[in-house]
Each structure stands twice: as structure tokens, then as C-alpha cells.
């Protein structure tokens, strides 16, 4: 399963760990992904989404129906 938020499009970023001595080692910054079921009243069913914590806040603000239409407009089947 890919580590990509379906709402915001956030994906892992790469960077460096920096020690006190300024040694650098490569690392990945992973998004805060959660799997969450949302009740969609218009479809009378649950929809299971893998999204970041920021994606959940966007759904709280805009509503699940509005976000689902945006996702489906991008060609993702839900």
C-alpha cells in the first residue's frame, strides 16, 4: 500500500538526520497517514480512506461529499 494521502497528495519526503557533530545520514520523512471510515449520507454507505491528519481536517472543514467529488474528479475510484 502506498504511503500517499488521497486528499492532500502528501507523500514521503527525503532529507538528512543531523547529529550533534553534523554528520548526515539519509532518512525519509513519512506523512502521518491514518485509515479512517467515513459515513457518506448521500450514498448510504461507509467509505474507507487512507489519508493524513491534515486530510481529516480538510474533510471536517469542507465535508465528505465535497472532498469525494474532488477525489473522483482526479480519476481515483472510490
UniProtKB/Swiss-Prot annotation:
GO biological process, alphabetically ordered: translation
Residue stretches in coiled coil: none
GO function terms (MF aspect): structural constituent of ribosome
Name under which the protein is recorded: Large ribosomal subunit protein bL28
One Pfam family per UniProt: Ribosomal_L28
Record NCBIfam families: L28 (TIGR00009)
HAMAP family linked to this entry: Ribosomal_bL28
Keywords: Ribonucleoprotein, Ribosomal protein
Record organism: Pseudoalteromonas atlantica (strain T6c / ATCC BAA-1087)
Gene3D superfamilies in the cross-refs: Ribosomal protein L28/L24 (2.30.170.40)
Record gene name: rpmB
Similarity comment: family membership: Belongs to the bacterial ribosomal protein bL28 family.
Keyword Metal-binding: no
Amino acid at each position: 500500500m502506498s504511503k500517499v494521502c488521497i486528499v492532500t497528495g502528501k507523500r514521503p519526503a527525503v532529507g538528512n538526520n543531523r547529529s550533534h557533530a553534523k554528520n548526515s545520514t539519509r532518512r525519509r520523512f513519512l506523512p502521518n497517514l491514518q485509515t479512517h471510515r467515513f459515513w457518506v449520507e448521500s450514498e448510504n454507505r461507509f467509505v474507507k480512506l487512507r489519508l493524513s491528519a491534515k486530510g481529516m481536517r480538510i474533510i471536517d472543514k469542507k465535508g465528505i461529499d465535497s472532498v469525494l467529488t474532488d477525489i473522483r474528479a482526479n480519476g481515483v475510484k472510490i
